[in-house]
Amino acid sequence: MKPPGPGNAPRIGVCCEELEALLEQAKREPLREEGYQKLKAAIRTLGYVTELLEKKETTLAALRELLCPASTGKTGKVLKQAGIHAGEKKPATESTSKKSKGAPAGHGRNGAAAYRGATKAPVPHASLKAGDPCPDAQCSGKVYLQRDPGVWVRIRGQAPLAATVYELEKLRCHLCGNVYTAEAPPEAGEKKYDESAASMIALLRYGSGVPWYRLRGLERSLGIPLPVATQCEIVAETAAPLQPALDELKRQAAPGEVVHHDDTSMRVLSLDRDADISPERTGVFTSGVVWIFQERRIALFFTGCKHAGENLAEVLKQRPADLPPPIQMCDALSRNVPKSFATLLANCLTHGRRNFVEVTSSFPEECRFVLETLGEVYGYDDQARTLGLSPEQRLHFHQEHSGPVMEKLKVWCGAQFAERKVEPNSGLGKAISYLLHHWEKLTLFLRVPGAPLDNNIAERALKKSILHRKNSLFYKNRNGAQMGDLFMSLIHTCELNRVNPFDYLNELQRHAGELKQAPSEWLPWNYRETLARTGALLHAA
């Protein structure tokens, strides 16, 4: 988690010439909103940087990283910035030599199979069918149907919302004055805003972080002028019927084998405090909790004064007492540990690695050794994932390959202090101390089946909340925060399980009554089977 400051606020690009122009404008007339925001950002940045400079532990490298953060934390990029170029790299390890030499994952074009939300349209041949003679005059064979058809993908754009204006014909009697209006067709529906409108607004707002004013502007430019208050009301009315799905996700998450979680700061303008929270605690947070249970992943978000460990404890209250403690992956902050429930605590190896990344420019060779050593461990974990190993097989694989590597790193860290090669209070000394102090929790993956290496999945989940904070700045009250938590939880759970969140939200609204009666049958991974079963029963009846 980053400390409060400019790094956690929306970045605004502004140059010295613009600031000078804003000052001149302020002498003549009141500033416009855009100019005011730029000037306010510049003043806040100056104040924050001044506070940092007054602290003796602040380094120029840390200040440069804060104001101009690196685009990547990959080892090669970090070492290159420290002056260690590709030509100086050590020989490839066994883990890296086995990797594919092709394009990096995620690059290149997608095949037709990747378009899971596309409509499939079978196209028969215009002049041939299976069994017909071959059109080639020099051939006497017959054509047959191939298993794989030819594929042509056509992609079209569409507006987030669409509207149909039904102009109902009206007839008036010239004698008695009665007016007779045509009835709306069945497809017009009974409600002005159908389920798909609410789903799309929620998906853009809480799934993609689009603020209300920007969403309103986009729709208005496309000819659908929907006020912010109306859209907010639509989403609020949708949230209540979907609450049983969130409650069921929490219940099914409680027996999970592994839980990842982290916190980020959030602002709620009007927040009534929980009775069990100390009055001295003034912060407001959003906790992102990702549970892994039987190959399923459940994302839960909690916004309020409670820390991640306290929110985790609320879910663990529903955990069956006969189950063993879950594996808990988080950073090393004490507030992340639930007070009243036992867990197998693992700390994030990426956090330990990040401490060395920050001081690489000052200690290039020492940090190079640590970064490449940890890179080797991650290489072995990638191999285990590629091979599809079970948790027990993965544990033995890591013990055989990563165990000696981590032991070598531990010996090296201890030698830096024992031989007085590193000053304990230096940046490198603090990074080494962090590793040694949390060594048992950082290496749980060498002792417990299924223990992860890092907390990256929770940090990625929190990006939804961070995106909301950067674009919308705050929630108005607790109800707004809870509504955001609900939709973020449902949407991100769908994404983690490769389910279409738009379709899922639509079906939950259409079957709100069934959802309330049997929420366990309307979860992202089984609602399709429930729909098929319900449809079959209705058809049979």
What function would you assign to each model-found segment?
Residues M1-E29, E33-K40, G111-Y115, G131, ...:
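Catalytic center-proximal scaffold of phosphoryl-transfer enzymes
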